[in-house]
Design a protein with these regions (language model features):
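Secondary-structure boundary motif
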Residues: 43-47, 121, 146-149
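A generic structural signal for alpha->beta connector loops
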Residues: 6, 50, 123-125
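A glycine- and Lys/Arg-enriched "phosphate-lid" helix/loop adjacent to the NTP-binding pocket
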Residues: 69-135, 139-141, 148
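Conserved substrate/cofactor phosphate-moiety recognition/catalytic segment
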Residues: 2-42, 140
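Conserved protein kinase catalytic core
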Residues: 17-18, 61, 95
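Anionic group-transfer/hydrolysis microenvironments
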Residues: 13, 56-59, 89-91
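Conserved nucleotide-sensing/catalytic segment adjacent to the nucleotide-binding pocket
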Residues: 23-70
Length: 149
């Protein structure tokens, strides 16, 4: 979507962290991941146009922390938020890429529920995106297009 919209994208720091450290994530790791992700977003937003696409942010890291450790740190919940969140439903096949978690569909659905509740608790706008291939991409395009950026 970035290519067709001209948007700047911010990748996922957590993936790099997990690839480098290969250890089970701790609370301190997740706080670091959230802070690093927010720093990447802040840096990109300085020169991005009206649309900045981010893979994740501190709010999503808070949801990860809840899933993995049973707590949602306020430090992460209080970080700046995006204008819109696309909540991707866990309706695609799971692919093991070496860092991906939760191969069990029940765990994936539980995580989606945790994310949805974190979004509600944070009071941010979000749209659920489901479907396969072009259907999923079209739904994401429509959600972003409705923002009139």
């Amino acid at each position: 979507m970035a290519a067709e919209t001209g948007a700047i994208t911010v990748g996922e720091y957590g993936r790099s962290h997990c690839e480098a450290h290969k250890e089970p994530l701790t609370r301190d790791d997740l706080l670091l991941i959230g802070a690093a992700q927010q720093a990447m977003i802040a840096a990109a937003s300085e020169w991005a146009g009206p649309l900045l696409l981010t893979d994740t942010d501190a709010l999503m890291t808070a949801a990860w922390c809840e899933m993995l450790l049973g707590e949602r740190p306020q430090e992460l919940m209080q970080a700046p938020k995006a204008d819109l969140y696309l909540l991707l439903e866990p309706d695609l096949p799971w692919i093991d890429d070496g860092t991906r978690f939760f191969s069990d569909p029940a765990d994936r659905h539980r995580f989606a529920t945790i994310v949805a509740q974190a979004l509600v608790d944070a009071g941010v706008p979000f749209i659920r995106i489901a479907g396969q291939g072009h259907e999923r991409l079209a739904a994401a395009r429509a959600a972003i297009g409705a923002m009139h950026v």
